[in-house]
Regions:
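Short hydrophobic clusters on alpha-helical segments that form packing/core surfaces
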Residues: 10-18, 56, 60, 84, ...
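C-terminal peripheral helix-coil segments that are non-catalytic and often amphipathic
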Residues: 153-208
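Basic, helix-initiating cap at the start of DNA-binding domains
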Residues: 1-21, 25-30, 34, 47-54, ...
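Hydrophobic alpha-helical bundle segments that form small-molecule/ligand-binding pockets
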Residues: 111-161, 201-204
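Short hydrophobic/aromatic patch on the recognition helix
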Residues: 36-46
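Hydrophobic alpha-helical connector segments
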Residues: 66-110, 114, 136
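Short, basic, alpha-helical segments at the C-terminal edge of helix-turn-helix-like DNA-binding modules
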Residues: 58-63, 71
């Protein structure tokens, strides 16, 4: 009798499948086929696809290093943002998973909690602190998703409108002619975005 795959093997095979397929095409049936097991046996380990995804997010979240050596909230947010992005780069479709599924697993909840801890002493309302961290995470996720799309489709999209772009959208055309569009997924673009968010928080603190 063949040995049934372990939970760790199921998780590693899930990442392999996500490397090959978009998230929307992932299914428990395809995963079971890859592992050489029945779907019912797979459901013995994970009650649903959502439960499996929660486990993937949880294990990946554990690898995100908290910037304990940074002294200011600005530096902590900046470095933490880079650390989050680094882990997103290590796992296929993780950014989309974390965007699509709310923080319910232990380590994902801890990640959110540590981010809230960084801004806890700021002179903002609790609602605004929560909005800030939600925006911060969404920026990180969408930056990685945009980067993945640029890797998959490195060529600039072809406009379908008949009017020349230089006439239709002259300001956009200026950037279209340069590398601005393809540099959106660069580390420079990402770090600028982090700094922009942090500067915006500083501005709000002065207003308050």
């Amino acid at each position: 009798m063949a040995t049934q795959p372990t939970k760790d093997k199921i998780i590693s095979s899930s990442w392999e499948l996500l490397e090959e397929l978009p998230l929307t095409d992932f299914s428990m049936r395809k995963l079971a086929s890859r592992l050489g097991m029945t779907v019912s046996s797979l459901y013995y380990h994970f009650s649903s696809k959502e439960a499996l995804f929660a486990e993937l997010i949880d294990k990946a979240s554990l690898e995100i290093i908290f910037p304990a050596n940074e002294k200011t909230w600005q530096d902590r947010l900046f470095v933490y943002g880079k650390n989050i992005y680094s882990v997103l780069e290590a796992y296929p479709n993780l950014a989309q998973l974390m965007m699509d599924y709310p923080p319910e697993s232990e380590n994902y909840l801890r990640l959110f909690d540590k981010l809230l801890m960084i801004v806890d002493d700021l002179k903002l309302s609790d609602d605004h602190k929560f909005y800030t961290i939600n925006l911060f995470l969404n920026f990180i996720y969408t930056s990685k998703i945009d980067r993945d799309r640029l890797v998959e489709q490195p060529e600039k999209p072809v406009s379908t409108v008949k009017t020349p772009l230089v006439q239709l959208a002259p300001f956009l055309y200026k950037y279209w002619r340069t590398e601005s569009l393809t540099s959106l997924g660069s580390s420079e673009s990402f770090e600028f975005g982090l700094q922009l968010i942090i500067s915006g928080i500083e501005k709000m603190l002065k207003i308050n």
